[in-house]
């Protein structure tokens, strides 16, 4: 008898069903919204802010997927199939900053690729998307930091070809200003991505 989780046939997950937050857990007095609030309640936190940046880009281009796929080889996809990697940075953090503002840095531009059909990572780091978006939360005053105000964001866009030609893995805002186009306000992001996609 083949044990659960082994064997050549493998396992295929059932389709994910989007939740609306009102659902209640069995065995604990809590809703899915309670869980979301606990996990993502502070949109200044690094991981959460990065996912917010991905969400903003997804909304801008009309990503047809109903749910974020955390293990995918790109962050966002457009309706025409252009794949996008979103990198996020900010001057302010959710913790005390005795040394002042954080430097604007974007890392892991190239990363090992996950092959879900073979259940393995690629040996070498690769540029995995057609377009890169560098999202910067620009607020510098902690008292004025409004996590819901999208005008506090600016976006820079470049093609994957530029990343490959420059052979960079981590870049600062100086590199972005020199080699990417922008900064764009949120309203100009979709057009900028479409333009960069022609160059990848």
Q: What role is predicted for each listed range?
A:
Residues 1-83, 87-200:
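Nucleic-acid endonuclease domains
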């Amino acid at each position: 008898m083949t044990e659960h989780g082994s064997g050549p046939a493998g396992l295929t997950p059932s389709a994910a069903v989007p939740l609306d937050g009102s659902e209640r857990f069995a065995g604990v007095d809590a809703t899915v919204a309670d869980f979301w609030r606990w996990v993502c309640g502070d949109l200044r936190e690094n991981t959460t802010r990065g996912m917010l940046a991905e969400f903003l880009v997804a909304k801008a281009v009309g990503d047809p997927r109903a749910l974020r796929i955390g293990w995918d080889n790109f962050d966002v996809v457009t309706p025409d199939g252009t794949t996008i990697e979103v990198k996020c940075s900010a001057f302010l953090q959710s913790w005390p900053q005795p040394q002042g503002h954080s430097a604007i840095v974007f890392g892991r531009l190239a990363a090992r690729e996950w092959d879900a059909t073979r259940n393995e990572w690629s040996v070498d780091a690769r540029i995995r998307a057609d377009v890169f978006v560098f999202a910067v939360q620009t607020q510098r005053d902690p008292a004025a930091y409004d996590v819901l105000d999208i005008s506090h964001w600016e976006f820079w866009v470049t093609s994957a070809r530029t990343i490959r030609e420059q052979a960079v893995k981590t870049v600062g805002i100086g590199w972005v200003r020199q080699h990417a186009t922008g900064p764009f306000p949120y309203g100009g992001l979709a057009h900028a991505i479409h333009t960069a996609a022609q160059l990848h």
